[in-house]
């Protein structure tokens, strides 16, 4: 196994990133760039056709890990002595093993790999490192910087100012990241609160839905029980508001109907008196053609004259009632009684004028009785329905 070739590759890639002023370390943000430089070396070797290689060296998952590390630990200092441990923790394999396994048919990196690639690396370092590896196998030598650091050329004040500027930048970045972290934590807490609220609403809606399903089942059971057994008592689980609203609606409709009927009765009392008299007289018996003439005559006569005429008629009726029995006795003495004599009309019913007078007074009495009955009915409805 050629440790010198691996060290040379690593030193070359490290030297492309590590600057003398940085102090022999690179930042976490430079890790993907270091891996890219190493991978470019092997891609160049494969294109030249000198070696058979297994490429790519790193999978996309490993590259994602490198990028994540660079984003989360941007200014994390990676020293050479700590690189192997950090790399192993990321991909669970050492970098040396990955590079050695890239060569097909060879168990290690060939010693002439760096020379054949003509890398811009000091040849003196390669020779010294190679001699040390051949002289003492298994003895690891510390890595040295290939170029002389220009820090010696700068004054201590300039170095201090540069470090102060770098520290201030790091502090500002740290403050910005802390603010961003606090904002993210606040958003996370708000999202948690909203999530709890939505969960409570969902639980409430689910409970209401379950209650509605149970109510629907109870209602279906009630309908089926009423269909099968009409005499069974109703279950008291129905919405009381809907029942009361339906009762109010029906009561209002009934109240309107009663009011309309009462108004109609009041109108009929004043307008249909004469018509009621005629209808009652027609229900009693059939009259002659002179009925209409007599009715018109009564309605045309003034009330005072009508009263006087009524008194005179009554007197005449009394006289006739005393005289007519004697006349009837002599007129109908020789008539034989018929089988239907009990169905014959009275003597005063055979006279059109007398029957008119009698039926007029009877109809007037019936109308007054009917009006009193209607008034009693109206009062009863008013008391029942609170009108």
UniProtKB/Swiss-Prot annotation:
Q: Which UniProt keywords apply?
A: Coiled coil, Cytoplasm, Cytoskeleton, Membrane, Nucleus, Transmembrane, Transmembrane helix
One Pfam family in the UniProt entry: MPS2
Q: Where in the cell is it found?
A: Nucleus membrane; Cytoplasm, Cytoskeleton, Microtubule organizing center, Spindle pole body
Chain segments annotated as transmembrane: 311-327
Cited InterPro entries: Mps2 (IPR031433)
Residue spans of biased composition, Polar residues class: 220-230
The name this protein goes by in its record: Monopolar spindle protein 2
Organism listed in the record: Saccharomyces cerevisiae (strain FostersO)
Question: Which taxonomic lineage is given here?
Answer: Eukaryota, Fungi, Dikarya, Ascomycota, Saccharomycotina
